[in-house]
């Protein structure tokens, strides 16, 4: 675009020059054409008259008119040429001003772009924006960019120098790693024996692996005698045993707890001094109390029945529930009697009563209400054979006098009429019995 503007500008300049040359050539040609046929007027007599005659001739008049017209044309051509030149000059000046403004703006944009690349401060950017010429912009740009490049090189050099200073040879790096590992192992060994921090600091300040080994040997040689302690792990995910050497139980416990912690075992600790054994049992997971079933207690039932004797147990949440279960059990086994309960031993006792009323028909015992489901019970414990024999012997001994009494009663008792509870019959029977007794006594006295 800029090149095209320059070409147009030079074409206009060339046209202006060509127009000026053409006008000058035209004026020169006209003057030559007018002057060429006229020669010097010879001096003759009566020249005034002759001149007057020639001046008024048609040829002379025509020539004069042509000369006047040519002069007018020349003047007009010159005026047009001058006006065109002035206009061209004004346009060229305006174009040059616009081109200069464009060049100035482009130079500023290029300079600011380069300043941003090097991180130049706003102070220098303002100087560029206030510059009036392209040459001034380029000069300032060159100076600022050169300074920025030098600053960058200096920073990079300093950074590289620091980096190189921080680097160590590969051999030194390997030695440093070996030294660090030796220190870690040495400190672990010292922890087993409960060595003080003073000796650990000596290890940490050692400069070579050999120095660490010498220190650890000296320290261990000076330590008191150690014992072997054992750890039993009862964890959810880790179970097993391990041992360690330590000067006392406290030191061993510290080592074992660290070991358990490293392996994610957290539980209750116990120690047996006789076997020098620690045991850690991991705690069970905590369960929400609302999810737990009620606690149950074991209750016992002692049965003293006519046909069933023994004991049984059941588990229940309270004594009332156990009592219902026991009564249902007794009822199912035909046991009905007097119930007692001992809270201290959680024991129920049912004793079946032996009641015989003469003349009364045996009646079935009333069954208690079974309002709850049966609770499984432990079957009643049978009575041992030896105990049973003893009981049978006692029963036989007890039955002998009872049999005599029963015989006496049978002899004295009248036949039943179905009204065993009639008071009148009872009184009559007693009177008869008394009379019979009196007669027997009297007859006996007479015999004596």
UniProtKB/Swiss-Prot annotation:
Sequence repeats lie at residues 104-140, 179-215, 228-282, 298-352. Residues 358-422 are annotated as: Disordered. SUPFAM superfamilies: Bacterial immunoglobulin/albumin-binding domains, Immunoglobulin-binding domains. Residues 418-448 form a propeptide. Residues 384-412 have a biased composition (Basic and acidic residues). InterPro entries: GA-like (IPR035152), Ig/albumin-bd_sf (IPR009063), IgG-bd_B (IPR000724), LPXTG_anchor (IPR019931), M_anchor (IPR019950), YSIRK_signal_dom (IPR005877). The keyword Ubl conjugation does not apply. One of its GO terms (cellular component) is extracellular region. Its main location: secreted. A motif (LPXTG sorting signal) lies at residues 414-418. It is found in: Secreted, Cell wall. Residues 228-352 are annotated as: 2 X 55 AA repeats. Residues 1-33 form the signal peptide. This is Immunoglobulin G-binding protein G. The modification Pentaglycyl murein peptidoglycan amidated threonine is found at residue 417. Pfam families: GA-like (PF17573), Gram_pos_anchor (PF00746), IgG_binding_B (PF01378). Gene3D superfamilies: 3.10.20.10, Albumin-binding domain. Disulfide bonds: none annotated. Binds to the constant Fc region of IgG with high affinity. It comes from the Bacteria. GO terms for molecular function: IgG binding. Residues 386-410 are annotated as: 5 X 5 AA repeats of [DE]-D-A-K-K. Keywords: Cell wall, IgG-binding protein, Peptidoglycan-anchor, Repeat, Secreted, Signal. It is a peptidoglycan-anchor. NCBIfam families: LPXTG_anchor, YSIRK_signal. Residues 104-215 are annotated as: 2 X 37 AA repeats.
């Amino acid at each position: 675009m800029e090149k095209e503007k320059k070409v147009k500008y030079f074409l206009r300049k060339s046209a202006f020059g060509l127009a000026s040359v053409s006008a000058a050539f035209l004026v020169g040609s006209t003057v030559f054409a007018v002057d060429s046929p006229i020669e010097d007027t010879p001096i003759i007599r009566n020249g005034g008259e002759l001149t007057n005659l020639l001046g008024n001739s048609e040829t002379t008049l025509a020539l004069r008119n042509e000369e006047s017209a040519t002069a007018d044309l020349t003047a007009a051509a010159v005026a047009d040429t001058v006006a065109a030149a002035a206009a061209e000059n004004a346009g060229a000046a305006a174009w040059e001003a616009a081109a200069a403004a464009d060049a100035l703006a482009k130079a500023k944009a290029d300079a600011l772009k380069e300043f941003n690349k090097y991180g130049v401060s706003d102070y220098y950017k303002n100087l560029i924006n206030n510059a009036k010429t392209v040459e001034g912009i380029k000069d300032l740009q060159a100076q600022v960019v050169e300074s920025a490049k030098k600053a960058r090189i200096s920073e990079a050099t300093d950074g590289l120098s620091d980096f190189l200073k921080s680097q160590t040879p590969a051999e030194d790096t390997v030695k440093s790693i070996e030294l660090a590992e030796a220190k870690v192992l040495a400190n672990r060994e010292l922890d087993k024996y409960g060595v003080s921090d003073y000796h650990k600091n000596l290890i940490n300040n050692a400069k070579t692996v050999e120095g660490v080994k010498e220190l650890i040997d000296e320290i261990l040689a000076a330590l008191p005698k150690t014992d072997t302690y054992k750890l039993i792990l009862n964890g959810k995910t880790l179970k097993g045993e391990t041992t360690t050497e330590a000067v006392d139980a406290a030191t061993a416990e510290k080592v074992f707890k660290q070991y358990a912690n490293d392996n994610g075992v957290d539980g209750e600790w116990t120690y047996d001094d006789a076997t020098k054994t620690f045991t850690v049992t991991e705690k069970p997971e905590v369960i929400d109390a609302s999810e737990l079933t009620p606690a149950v207690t074991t209750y016992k039932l002692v049965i003293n029945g006519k046909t069933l004797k023994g004991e049984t147990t059941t588990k229940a949440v309270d004594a009332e529930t156990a009592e219902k279960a026991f009564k249902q059990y007794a009822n199912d086994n035909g046991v009905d009697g007097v119930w007692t309960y001992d809270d201290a031993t959680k024991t129920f006792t049912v004793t079946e009563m032996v009641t015989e009323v003469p003349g009364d028909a045996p009646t079935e015992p009333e069954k208690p209400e079974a309002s709850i489901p049966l609770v499984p019970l432990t079957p009643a414990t049978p009575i041992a054979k030896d105990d049973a024999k003893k009981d049978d012997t006692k029963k036989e001994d007890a039955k002998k006098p009872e049999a005599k009494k029963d015989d006496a009663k049978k002899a004295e008792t009248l036949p039943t009429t179905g009204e065993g509870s009639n008071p009148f019959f009872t009184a009559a029977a007693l009177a008869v019995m008394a009379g019979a007794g009196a007669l027997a006594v009297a007859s006996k006295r007479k015999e004596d």
